Swiss-Prot record:
InterPro entries on file: LolA/LolB/LppX (IPR029046)
Provenance organism: Streptomyces griseus
Gene3D superfamilies linked: 2.50.20.20
Protein name: Uncharacterized 31.2 kDa protein in rplA-rplJ intergenic region
Superkingdom field: Bacteria
C-alpha cells in the first residue's frame, strides 16, 4: 500500500513540474475579437524599428485577454510533449490545456502509473488542477483531479517550489517579447507566412550572464527581475523568435536554449484571440489535494529533488 502511495505521489510530483514548464511556454497576445488571421502585408510593426515595434507588441500583449494555443515542447531526455487549448491572462494565467507526452522520463512515469500519457490541465490565479485519467483515479479513491496550490508548492518544495510558483504566476504572454527586448541584439529577419498568415519575423539571443542595462532595452528593474527568473529556471542562453501579424499580434513563437539540465526547445502557435476560456473548477467531490497526497506519501515540506 505504501509503495502504491509513494508511486502515485511521485507521479503527481512529476506532473507538477511538467505543468509549470507548460505555463512557462504558454505565451500569447492579441486584441479581443481578432482571430489572428491577418490579411495582406504585416502592418504597423513591420514599418517600425525592431525595438519600437516590439515595445508596441508588448504593450498590446499586456492588455490582451485570451487566445487558443497549440504547440510542442522538448526538454532533453526529461520530456517531449504537445499541448493545445485556450489560455487567458487578464489576471494571472488561466485556461485549460490538453497535454500529451510523446517521450521522456515524465511520459514514462505517467504510463507506469497506468495512464496513456495525456493530462487535462486547468489553470487558475492561485492554483491549477491535473486529471491523469481513470488509472490514476483508481489510486486516489476514485478522484480524477489533483489540485496544486501555488502557495503549497512554494512551501513544500523549498527553493524549487518557489521556482514552480514563480514560473506559473509570472508566465504572462509578453514574456517572449520581453526576452527579445532584454537580448539587446534583436533583429528583424523579414516577412514570412505562418500557416497562411503574413507575418514579420524577429529574432534575438539572450545570454543570461551577459545581460546588462547598457545593452538591454528593458529598464533596470525589469531587467533584474527577468534575469532572476531565467537564473532560477536554470536558463543560461535562450534564442527567441516571434512572428507578428499586421495587427501586431503574435501568431508564432519559438524558444531554444540551454538549461542546467540540458537543451530545450518549444514552438507555440496562437489564434482566435478573445476566445472563451473555461473558468469552472473541477468538482470538489472529484478532487484530491496534492498537499494531502504528500502527507500520505510521507513527504515533508522543503524536500527537493
Amino acid at each position: 500500500m505504501r509503495t502504491s502511495t509513494a508511486r502515485r505521489t511521485g507521479t503527481a510530483l512529476a506532473v507538477a513540474a511538467a505543468l509549470t514548464s507548460i505555463a512557462a511556454c504558454s505565451g500569447s497576445d492579441g486584441a479581443k475579437g481578432s482571430d489572428g488571421a491577418g490579411e495582406g502585408k504585416a502592418g504597423a510593426v513591420s514599418k517600425a524599428s525592431p525595438v519600437a515595434a516590439l515595445k508596441q507588441v508588448q504593450q498590446k500583449t499586456g492588455g490582451a485577454q485570451s487566445a487558443k494555443v497549440e504547440g510542442t515542447t522538448e526538454m532533453g531526455s526529461v520530456m517531449s510533449m504537445k499541448q493545445s487549448g485556450a489560455i487567458g491572462w487578464a489576471d494571472g494565467l488561466s485556461g485549460a490545456l490538453t497535454i500529451t507526452y510523446t517521450g521522456g522520463t515524465m511520459g514514462d512515469a505517467l504510463k507506469q502509473a497506468g495512464g496513456d500519457g495525456s493530462v487535462q490541465a486547468r489553470y487558475f490565479k492561485d492554483e491549477y488542477y491535473a486529471n491523469m485519467g481513470d488509472a490514476m483515479a483508481a489510486n486516489t479513491g476514485g478522484k480524477h483531479w489533483i489540485r496544486y496550490s501555488y502557495k503549497d508548492l512554494a512551501e513544500l518544495g523549498g527553493a524549487s517550489g518557489d521556482v514552480m510558483k514563480d514560473q506559473i504566476q509570472n508566465s504572462t504572454p509578453e514574456q517572449g517579447v520581453k526576452a527579445l527586448l532584454a537580448s539587446g541584439d534583436v533583429k528583424k529577419v523579414g516577412q514570412e507566412d505562418v500557416r497562411g498568415v503574413p507575418a514579420t519575423h524577429y529574432s534575438g539571443t539572450v545570454d543570461v550572464a551577459g545581460l546588462t542595462a547598457k545593452n538591454s532595452n528593458l529598464d533596470a528593474e525589469q531587467l533584474a527581475a527577468f534575469k532572476e527568473q531565467l537564473a532560477l529556471a536554470g536558463v543560461t542562453t535562450q534564442t527567441v523568435d516571434i512572428w507578428v501579424d499586421k495587427n501586431d499580434l503574435l501568431v508564432k513563437k519559438t524558444e531554444r536554449g540551454e538549461m542546467k539540465t540540458g537543451s530545450f526547445n518549444s514552438t507555440i502557435f496562437y489564434s482566435d484571440y478573445g476566445t472563451e476560456v473555461p473558468t469552472e473548477k473541477p468538482a470538489a467531490s472529484d478532487t484530491v489535494d496534492f498537499k494531502e497526497m504528500l502527507k500520505q506519501g510521507g513527504a515533508t515540506p522543503g524536500a527537493t529533488s
